[in-house]
Amino acid sequence: MVRKKNPPLRNIASEGEAQITESAASKREDTISSKEISTDPMQENSEQSGLVEHNSDDHSFHDQEPSSSINKDSASLSLSERAVVNYSHLKGRNVYFSPMEVTDRNMLALVTTDTRSACDPLKSPIKSEADDTQELASSASVDSLEAKEENDMSPRATDFTVQCGKVDCQSSSPASVASDNLHVPSDGIAGLNKSQAVLLVNDNSDSAPLSPELQDFKCNICGYGYYGNDPTDLIKHFRKYHLGLHNRTRQDVELDTKILALHNMVQFSQSKDFQKMNRSVLSGVLQDFNSPRPVLLNGTYDVQVTFGETFIGIGRKTPDCQGNTKYFRCKFCNFTYLAKSATELEQHFLKTHPNKMKMSSDSGKPSEKSTNKSSPIPRSCEPGDLGKWQDKITVKAADDIPVGYSVPIKPVDSCRQNGTDDTNYYWCKFCSFSCESSSNSKLLEHHSKQHGGGKSESPNSDLNDEIFRGSVINQNEITKSSDEQLPTKIDKGLAKKKDVSSVPTEDIIVTNYNCQFCDFRYSKSHGPEVILVGPLLRHYQQHHNIHKCTIKHCPFCPRGLCTPEKHLGEITYPFACKKSNCSHCALLLLHLSSGGTESTRVKHQCDQCSFSSPDVDVLLLHYENAHEAQACEIKQELNHQHGADGQPSIKEIKEHSCTKCDFIVQVEEDLPRHYRRVHNCYKCRQCNFTAADTQSLLDHFNSAHCQEFEITTSNGGEHHGTSSIKEEPKTDLKVYNLVTPDSKMGEAIFDSTVKKEKLEDKETLREKAWSDGSVDDLRGVAWRAPDILRTSPSYSQMGLGLLTTVSVNQDQQKSSRDSPNVEAAHLARPVYGLSIEPKGFQGVTAGASGEKSGQHTPQYPTAGDSKSKDESQSLLRRRRGSGVFCANCLTTKTSLWRKNANGGYVCNACGLYQKLHSTPRPLNIIKQNNGEQIIRRRTRKRLNPEALQPEQLTKHQRASSEEQANGSPLDIRSEDHSMEGHQRENQQLSMNKYGSQASLTKSHSAQQTMIVSQTMDIHKRMQPLHIQIKSPQESSGEPGNSSSVSDGKGSSERGSPIEKYMRPIKHPNYSPPGSPIEKYQYPLFGLPFVHNDFQSEADWLRFWSKYKLSVPGNPHYLSHVPGLPNPCPNYVPYPTFNLPAQYSSVGSDNDIPLDLAMKHSRPGSGTNGDSKEKSKSPVSVKDDGPLNVTKIEKSDKSTQDELSTKCVHCGIVFLDEVMYALHMSCHGESGPFQCSICQHLCTDKYDFTTHIQRGLHRNIAQAEKNGKNKD
């Protein structure tokens, strides 16, 4: 015969009428007994004979006679021989054995076809253990089989099966075996009764499975585990890390077998007496645990705690558990504790989840508990003898205060339902004390000693009593009314209980009541004619200051129209008013009292006494009169959990409960996930509102909670009037025109409707609604009175500063040329989740040139824009890389957009750098070629700026304006040249605008155009910090860059806007402190790259004073100032005062922060060559110092050490003192982050930077002015 060097761990199965007589425990006991019998176990392990017919005199386990008998028996039955499949855990494959061959380590192949009941494989005691332990824990029937030892047999009774070949095994094994017909003759197994099937191992299948079942293998010592079908890794782990045996040898088979036996043996892993595994245990000195196993095991070796027949929780052994302690956790809530027994879990279950109790009438076995103590539990001998849940009695002290509860324990031989001589199980209501006694004297004595003679030390003791009492209320009445008390079954929180006996009785209803404002909850069992909602109503009245007359816990109950069916499950009412006084109280009282008795079907019963009333108000009055003292106590105790105003404090509430089920969690973030996964809905974090999808949730949030945020946010503007605007139906998508061609600034166009975006856009929007639009992003968005009148929102710093620009659909772009679009649905409130879209800027381009002056505010997209439009479009545009720029390097070209820590979009390079180094990507590491990032060169090839032909420049500038301005009118025109006449008109207007720009190059409108185009170019190129302009001619052409590019004019004059940075005026080591953003961030101050070579400090100071004077939206702000060059009127971030007007304006335009440039991309329209005011307004909005600050902050992180002047508040380092002084002048006196221009208090340096960069104070001022003009 073939002998296997390493015995596989395999499954052994018997066929036919296989009768399970062993459990995993008894199997392990086989190992114990075999160890005792074996004279030389190691010899047996390694040297057992492989053939039954061979002489086995050398081995102590097999006589030649039994071997021959076995051989004969198997030979006579060879007609039906079949291959026995065994799984080798060592080789990971199935090994087929002939039924005639027996291996020394694997099995004795005994195939009997007579009734297919004889033992197929027999194996030696040790080997059988080794082979089967692999499957021991995974067998699906292990847990259930362990409890099914039908015959009273000793743990070693089954040793016969594996030691049948030994003559003298009878002396060490009991004669009684699993089958009465099975006996052991002296010659071995020759007399084996083939009509009886004996299962030798823990597998009850008819044939050996082809492969072991997947199971959890877990180390009982350290918790190491894995999921699979091979225990080899577990054995290796245990040997190496717990035994120090690093080399595996063939002689360790016995040790491996014992390791697996210990890990799979329930007694060892769960017994209280099994404190620690040691080497002696592993060597075979195993204790014999005969005590019945009190707990069940699942695949992870958790203790399953049951009470009666109800599975109430688990006990888990974790690495931090010492000794026999475990973490016990309630199945129905988050209650968890560390202890050795589950007594406290049972008491918790009785108090908190009485309605989850399951009692089966046909249960004839005592309930299993998960503690090894003989703690009293209900016992029964006959169906119906079990201590009934309804028999639970509240034990009260002399002063009528509940001190505990008791459940009668029926003797095993007693079938009486309520025997007076029965022992009762008592437990204290305030602690874990419990006892068995025939009277309540012990409980009362304990209460008087430990709990002050009736005064509860627990702050919520009365509440707990109130909660628990509901589960036993009216039990005496129910018992009297029924002929026989029968167990009831509650099906997972459903409130209705029905008797399972043939004796008819009234329905028992159990209802769960939950408070909508806190974690107060309780369960009440009651009859069909009463409802025990009083405690909930009283709770609302006392702890939430809800007037009793406004309490409507059910729309039917106040008038007595409700039925028990209406109260099945959980009561989440009332929809109670939170007002402390209600003007409707008197009428409500009259209404309820008058109609309460007309059709009374259900009464409201007091949970403290037998009083009942069909009227809720009468019941509450009864509580006040009869139970006022106790109510006051409860209120006082509960107030510890609530704020001083009676409302629950968010910080103090430790548990958060689901309103749809019993789920309770301590981490608030886990609750929305629970709603999403379990109930397939979305819950508002501000209230209990749940929505079927994110769209509905966002709509609810915008309509219900945005108002609160508006009130709390202040940006120096007025927030009143928000609530006065009605929110129009969302289906009615009306467009409000902020600037009409007729120069009617404030009129809303209700005729034109916006086409709905594509379905896929909306889907994308819904997916990204919450990620893109956070509450913080629009923290500063607020409505101002003038804006409300004009139906246009005013944006505060955060509204625009933290949101990225987005593009629009062409359909919307068409309408946006006439005016920015605002959906009426969210007009009254800021819509969270929307991003700023360049379309807001583009709306300016469409209008006539004379209409631009008051259009400043409208240029920005409104926060109230429809989420589904704006955000979906923003996402689409962002995907294409258009309309979005990197918040760090200002590039618009990247293979992947990322988000930084502040939620802003950054390019892939900057995002990866900041992720790796936790600091913004500095400028000096950005590879450039002629001032352009190489990264962007991959996206588009550019010629030498000087070599570019006018046509090429026009085309390139057109593309840049399209990206930055979200599509310039010219580009849109080229794309949509076949659009309707209305679109053509808009395009023509924009063309005229741009056409006129060439002639207005030196005018303010032209300057504004220059700003827009240059900023757009800057946006695209992210130029080096060195501000260098090639020549005035080139710069002069720049004004028309974005707009005149449309016409192809002026762009050729200037060449590439990059050139201004290409001049080698700065030293090679000259670089902004940190992030390249800085060069764009501070238009007037804080930008180190405007060197003193270009202008004197006096010019800077004069410019700064002019800047401050023009802050409130001064109309002269953008006008040409005699003392300053054109850059000042344009409010270019880095004006070069000493240069020619044309030259300086160009340079300043290009220096404009990208953010402004993007917003000014609309200014292209503003530059239509219309009135100066027009150009002023857009410019001022765009030029607002905001850009400067935003980027400065980022640079703060990567400032360079060699720079000397640093802002202590923002951490920004400046190259010269003048820039530093300009920056510091932005800080107000009231705080380090107060804006000195509009006195707005920013929360931190990032908020301050964004505020200054975006220049929202200018927006507000201009908006006010526009509003006045409209009026």
UniProtKB/Swiss-Prot annotation:
**Low complexity composition bias: which ranges?**
1031-1049
**Mainly resides where?**
nucleus
Superkingdom to which the source organism belongs: Eukaryota
Compositional bias per record (Polar residues), positions renumbered to this chain: 34-49, 66-76
Basic and acidic residues bias: where?
54-65, 972-985, 1050-1062, 1170-1196
Zinc finger spans (GATA-type) are 886-910
| Keyword Repeat applies | yes
Which residue stretches are annotated zinc finger (C2H2-type)? 217-242, 328-353, 426-451, 513-543, 604-627, 656-679, 682-705, 1205-1227, 1233-1257
Instruction: Note the Pfam families from the entry.
Output: GATA
The record's annotation in InterPro entries points to: TRPS1 (IPR028440), Znf_C2H2_sf (IPR036236), Znf_C2H2_type (IPR013087), Znf_GATA (IPR000679), Znf_NHR/GATA (IPR013088)
Q: Name one GO biological process term.
A: regulation of transcription by RNA polymerase II
Per UniProt, which keywords does this protein have?
A: DNA-binding, Isopeptide bond, Metal-binding, Nucleus, Repeat, Repressor, Transcription, Transcription regulation, Ubl conjugation, Zinc, Zinc-finger
Describe how it is modified after translation. Answer: Sumoylated. Sumoylation in the repressor domain inhibits the transcription repression activity. Sumoylation on Lys-1191 is the major site. Appears to be sumoylated on multiple sites.
What the entry lists under CDD domains is as follows:
ZnF_GATA
Q: What does this protein do?
A: Transcriptional repressor. Represses expression of GATA-regulated genes at selected sites and stages in vertebrate development.
User: What is the protein's quaternary organization?
Assistant: Binds specifically to GATA sequences.
Q: What is this protein called?
A: Zinc finger transcription factor Trps1
Organism from which the protein derives: Xenopus laevis (African clawed frog)
- Gene assigned in the entry: trps1
